[in-house]
Amino acid sequence: NINVLVLDFYEVTFMDSSGIGFVLGRYRIVSSFGGNVEVVNLSQRLYSMMKLAGLEKLVTLKTK
């Protein structure tokens, strides 16, 4: 069983809407199995972008 999928964004310096779509797609898959998604090591800029997109309501967001 999948409990938590951790996406490490440590080396990610740029992301557009396709990145948001990637995270949402993984959320849909993992949540269908009862799991959660964590996005970790986000820069402040990427954290703000994901929060603006409303992802903090679906996944756990953690900054560097």
Give the location of each predicted region.
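Amphipathic alpha-helical interaction surfaces in cytosolic regulatory modules
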Residues: 2-58
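Short acidic-hydrophobic, aromatic-tinged amphipathic segments that line or gate anion-handling sites
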Residues: 60-64
